[in-house]
Curated annotation (Swiss-Prot):
Protein's recorded name: Uncharacterized protein MJ1279
Domain of life: Archaea
Length: 185
């Protein structure tokens, strides 16, 4: 009888550790996802130039060494529990920006910027906005991504092909908004 009780005690402790590990995974799956995004961009020829965080928002800037095009990412870490991750999935609010070097602000961007401003007033998701920092003109768009679409929660296995395809689709689509202005004088 004592041996059975000891065996049951050990089973309960092992199960407790398994449950604790699942809870821990729910708190860092977003960091795994951000690491996967960084890896995907560096695999596509970008270098990480800048990184900052205030705890809730993470900021990254990448530059392509051949084209000098830039990608900026602002990611908001949304709180999620183990239940959230398993039932509805871990989500991340993320803004992608694609930038090209343009000398001066092209006049046609003012009209596009107004359209972007008006669409931003309607909704943040899918709104196209423009910004100019003196050297680069960026086009921005924000969305929610479901982390579980890219990372298997149980194994933390990353679907690299899906992540690469989706990031390239975002960059390619944003690049089209600046295509007519891409000539550097």
């Amino acid at each position: 009888m004592v041996i059975l009780m000891d065996k049951r005690f050990i089973e309960l402790i092992k199960k407790g550790w398994k449950l604790k590990n699942e809870e821990n995974k729910a708190t860092y799956i977003d960091e795994v996802f951000l690491g996967a995004i960084i890896t995907t961009l560096t695999d596509n020829g970008y270098v990480l130039m800048d990184i900052a965080s205030n705890g809730n928002f993470h900021y990254f800037m990448f530059e392509h060494l051949e084209s000098w095009d830039r990608i900026k990412i602002v990611a908001e870490v949304l709180p999620h529990s183990l239940t959230d991750v398993k039932v509805i999935g871990a989500r991340m609010f993320i803004e992608f920006s694609y930038g090209v070097m343009i000398k001066g602000i092209p006049p046609s961007l003012f009209g596009l910027g107004l359209k972007g401003y008006l669409s931003q007033m309607l909704s943040n998701i899918g709104s196209i906005r423009y910004e100019y920092d003196g050297y680069y003109t960026f086009v921005n768009c924000a969305t929610y991504l479901l982390i579980n679409d890219y990372i298997d929660f149980d194994t933390l296995t990353i679907d690299w092909e899906k992540l690469n395809n989706d990031i390239n689709a975002i960059i390619s689509s944003l690049a089209k908004y600046l295509e007519i202005h891409k000539k550097v004088e």
